[in-house]
């Protein structure tokens, strides 16, 4: 309330090893029904509705239970319009996800490839973007991430006419239950690097204010609307 910032909570599930026992035996349609309820009615009996579906895939590609999760997410998205954001390491895994989602009938414009900067081949990023999903480059401002790599990936997408498929994120501020202070092992990072450093750097490289507005305002608004 003090900042008027909108906080969007997800429904969904993490990768195979972290799926709770209560969800492991569900069919894809049963899981989709659960997620649709959290999107349209509220989470865990509250009136707080989820605003998107979040999944995670194993680094070597979707495992059988994760394929079930993809099918459930596609069903829930098709019935609600909610976007699906997926923790995805590398272009090969992203292609596998997109194939499963498309086969399940999903319009790939309702899919966000989270952590797309983990794919170093810019041609793979552009190929993926042309299939319709949002390409999210995150860890902006992170000490463990090359900011030059993020910059080159963003510019490659923009110069290829794909700025409407680009999202930028800090991937910061999450709570770590393994530590008493709740901080990630890499330490606390705020939410200022994008506005204070990355966008000015894009401008210095000749990217217009209209384009940066599209990437930071219009694209996320369109992605999360349903």
What are the language-model segments listed below?
Residues 1-78, 134, 139-144:
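Active-site gating/metal-coordination segments in enzymes
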Residues 6-8, 50-52, 83-85, 110-112, ...:
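Structural preference for beta-strand elements that scaffold enzyme active sites
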Residues 42-120:
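Divalent metal-binding pocket/active-site signature
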Residues 103-109, 159-162, 204-208:
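Short helix-capping segments at alpha-helix termini
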Residues 114-119, 138-156:
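Active-site glycine- and acidic-residue-rich loops that bind
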Residues 138-139, 162-186, 212:
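Short acidic/histidine-rich active-site segments
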């Amino acid at each position: 309330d003090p900042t008027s910032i909108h906080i969007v909570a997800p429904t969904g599930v993490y990768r195979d090893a972290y799926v709770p026992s209560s969800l492991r035996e569900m069919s894809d349609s049963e899981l989709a029904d659960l997620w649709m309820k959290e999107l349209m009615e509220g989470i865990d009996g509250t009136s707080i509705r989820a605003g998107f579906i979040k999944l995670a895939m194993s680094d070597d590609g979707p495992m059988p239970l994760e394929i079930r999760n993809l099918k459930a997410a596609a069903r829930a998205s098709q019935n609600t319009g909610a976007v699906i954001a997926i923790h995805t390491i590398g272009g090969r895994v992203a292609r596998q996800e997109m194939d499963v989602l498309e086969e399940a009938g999903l319009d790939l414009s309702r899919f966000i490839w989270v952590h797309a900067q983990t794919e170093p081949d810019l041609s793979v990023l552009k190929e993926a973007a042309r299939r319709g999903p949002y390409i999210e480059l995150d860890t902006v401002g992170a000490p463990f991430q090359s900011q030059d790599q993020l910059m080159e990936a963003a510019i490659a997408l923009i110069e290829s006419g794909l700025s409407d498929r680009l999202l930028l994120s800090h991937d910061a501020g999450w709570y770590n239950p393994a530590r008493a202070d709740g901080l990630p092992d890499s330490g606390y990072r705020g939410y200022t690097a994008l506005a204070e450093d990355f966008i000015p750097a894009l401008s210095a490289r000749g990217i217009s204010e209209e384009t940066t507005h599209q990437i930071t305002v219009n694209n996320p608004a369109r992605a999360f609307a349903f």
